[in-house]
Structures are given as C-alpha cells and as structure tokens.
C-alpha cells in the first residue's frame, strides 16, 4: 500500500507564525585530518563526522565546510541538538563555485529554512543535511537567478513553521519530515535552487 502526502496536503491550515529568536551555540574545532586524496574521500570523512555526532550519547549538530576544488576542510563547527551557529563564515575566503556545507540534523531530517537562508546569503554553493542513518537532503544554487527570491523564501519559511506547529509539536516527526521535503521541492525552483533527497516523501508499506 502506498501512503502519499500529496492528496492531503491542502488541508493544512495556513497560520502565519513569527519565529522566536533562539540563542545559538557553536564552537569551531580542528579537523581530524586534511590530507584527502579525492572529493569522495573528503565527503566520506565529512559525512562520518556529521553522522557520528548525531549518534553520540548527547546528539549534537556537527558542520563541516569543505572546498571541493582543493579537497580541503575549510572549517568545522559543533553546536547543540537544534542549532549550529557558523561564527566567522562571513570573513572566510570561500570559493563561490566549490564550497559545500555538510551537517547533521539530530532533530528533523530535511533541509531547514535556516539552511536555505545560508545558501541564499553566503558564497556556499551547496548545503547537505544528514540524518542519523546517513540519508541526505541537498539544496544547491542554480545558475539562473530568480526575481522575488526574498518573497519566495518568506513563503517557504512560513509554510515550514506551519508544518512544525501542525506536526512536529505533536510528535508526528516522520510525517513532518515528509511534508517539509515536499514543501521544499515546491519552493526550491522558485528560489533559483535545486533540491534533492534520498528519502522519499511518499512512504511505501
């Protein structure tokens, strides 16, 4: 039997929510190594760092910022279970075509509105989020720029907060993840972004 989110999606009530500001914590840490022989080697390392943090005794968000042209780790940050503030990223000399941000999501799997804000407002070209099993969701910049990106981002952000209020706050995390996956698929092209994930918003049973 197939369960699809799509037919029931329009029943969600649209409620404009103003998000509260949350104090974010982060610490910059040294990479365990920086002698990568290939981009695959670099990604394998970054993925392990992110997933190991989620599966630790006290799960936290670990972020690895990489340059895929040089195959180097530019910086690593650790946060808490909900946030990882990227202090100092705006001062880094980042290659706008080859900088990718990889991080873990201890709470919620899909790319978040904060992740989308990062890719829209920094030289980062891709943001990848992992869950505890190493499954990913990815958002990347496209060449064509879209007008009214700020308006579209705001629509996306509000819809994400609606889903959190409707589902996540009630413990419906699996449905919430699938709903947010669908919402980003809808809004990403309108923001000039490409979105991919390897977990589906349609659950087969």
Predicted regions and their residues:
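Divalent-metal-activated hydrolytic enzyme cores
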Residues: 15-23, 27, 124-205
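A short catalytic or substrate-binding loop motif that flags glycine-/basic-rich loops and adjacent residues
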Residues: 55-59
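Short beta-strand scaffold segments in enzyme catalytic cores
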Residues: 61-68, 127-130
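Non-Sec secretion/translocation targeting segments of pathogen effectors
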Residues: 1-19
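Charged, amphipathic alpha-helical segments
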Residues: 34-52, 109-114
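Short, compositionally biased leader-like segments
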Residues: 14-40, 102
């Amino acid at each position: 039997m197939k369960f699809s989110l799509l037919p029931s999606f329009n029943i969600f009530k649209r409620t404009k929510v103003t998000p509260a500001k949350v104090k974010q914590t982060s610490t910059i840490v040294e990479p365990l190594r920086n002698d990568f022989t290939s981009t695959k080697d670099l990604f394998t390392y970054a993925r392990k760092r992110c997933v190991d943090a989620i599966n630790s005794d006290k799960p936290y968000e670990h972020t690895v910022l990489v340059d895929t042209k040089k195959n180097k780790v530019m910086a690593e940050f650790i946060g808490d279970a909900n946030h990882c503030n990227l202090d100092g990223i705006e001062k880094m000399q980042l290659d706008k075509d080859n900088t990718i941000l990889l991080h873990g999501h201890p709470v919620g799997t899909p790319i978040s509105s904060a992740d989308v804000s990062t890719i829209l407002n920094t030289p980062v070209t891709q943001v990848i989020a992992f869950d505890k099993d190493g499954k990913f969701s990815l958002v990347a910049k496209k060449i064509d720029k879209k007008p009214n990106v700020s308006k579209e981002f705001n629509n996306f952000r509000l819809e994400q907060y609606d889903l959190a209020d409707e589902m996540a706050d009630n413990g419906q995390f699996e449905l919430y993840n699938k709903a947010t996956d669908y919402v980003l698929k809808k809004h990403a092209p309108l923001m000039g972004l490409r979105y991919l994930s390897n977990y589906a918003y349609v659950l087969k049973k």
